[in-house]
Amino acid sequence: NPFSIINTATDRWQNRKRGWKALGLQSEVGRDARAFNIKEWMDDTGDVQVATQSDTSIFDPALCELLYTWFVPKPDKSQVHQRPQVLDPFAGGSVRGIVAAQMGLDYYGHELREEQVLANRQQYEDIGGEGICTWIPGDSAKTLIETYTEEFAADFMLTCPPYGDLEVYSDDPADISNMAAHDFDEAYADIMQKALAHMKKNTFVAVVVGDYRDKHGYLCNFVSKTIAACEVWGCRLFNEIILQNVVGTLALRVARQFETNRKIGKLHQNVLIFYNGDPKTMKDDGWHTMNLVQNRTLAEWL
């Protein structure tokens, strides 16, 4: 149901997630030992609570499926390019691309790290799909300008930017997860606005974000900064969804964390849905749906 809270801990959600993983999704491939920032998994005494590469954040494929189903319009038969096109300025791993391809969408993801792009392309080659996945290596601030002709226009944007320096993905100076807070905010807003310039009018934009803490322990208000970056372009906030995460190891960490510094255990992310146009123009002729006949492995789980 299209409610404002999604609980990812339910059996139904986890089955759907397992179904996608059964296709062979390995979004963590391509990330080396620097691909997560261990400080977030330490308490104030310096004791490591969880510190393995498997803890690098992986985008939820079930969330991809849901957002593509809810917010990607049906193909326009009058257009030369009939498959809907998804733009992702902060691609990271392979999940958003491969789920898009499996659902008959064409995906364009911008990713700074060459090794991650190569791993993603191999994943797509192994798994395939009805749609086409294209990962563009390089700094999104540049590749979003250099890659496309003026005729290119995406039907949907789905992205998940770095949460400040919560996870550090590389030591590349162009990697915004390496930047100081002020520089990060400016670079992030710049990339978002360059991506929004490639959106069709009257389309949706979904950004999965969460507030993170600065070096002093204060929340950085990343949600509000994301809203501001989009609304400057004229892309207005239309829906907000709270994505409730699985408790997992948080149950073990939160008591000690709260006792030490009164920090609440974070159990959710924010899925911000923007509309790039006039809501009055929305059509009621349906939205994109996945052909499960072409996804037998997944269909067994659903």
Spans of model-derived segments:
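Class I S-adenosyl-L-methionine-dependent methyltransferase catalytic core
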Residues: 1-302
